[in-house]
């Protein structure tokens, strides 16, 4: 991990990568979905907790279920995308810590602490969702993350037992570059950073 990636790779992951809202008809295959997860799973989470859970919504039936909870401004985006990922978290993630972090007991620090469980799960599943976006870009896909949906309705539809809870949605596929908006600016270093 000692070398800097070449500029074309950095462009693909960050500098030239765009958030897509329109998509080509090229499908996202099972092999691609597996490759995507097999990349993102290696990225760091607190105590290797890996609370993120991912539901890859592709079928017309599953899309129809999902669209019931999507904000009106996002409906067409989800319809057009070959795959929409529900980035969720497992409220019982800590039960797997003996397997995921065998070096010492991390599970007991969460037992009986629902606020800590929720805070840790939300933060780290959001991290894993960001890793999903980078993994998608690394594999030549595009991504379009969204937070405009009814969490309660979605969770009732897809996670009725209450164990998993939704964090955000992310369309993935092969974006239609001709339908991109002009690139929006970003904050300058001086506006967003402090060095102490």
Swiss-Prot record:
Transmembrane segments: none annotated. Belongs to the nitroreductase family. HadB/RutE subfamily. It comes from Rhodopseudomonas palustris (strain TIE-1). PANTHER family: MALONIC SEMIALDEHYDE REDUCTASE RUTE-RELATED. Its EC number is 1.-.-.-. Pfam families: Nitroreductase (PF00881). The keyword NADP applies. Keywords: Flavoprotein, FMN, NAD, NADP, Oxidoreductase. This is Putative NADH dehydrogenase/NAD(P)H nitroreductase Rpal_4764. Coiled coil: none annotated. Its cofactor is FMN. One of its GO terms (molecular function) is oxidoreductase activity. HAMAP family: Oxidoreductase_RutE_HadB.
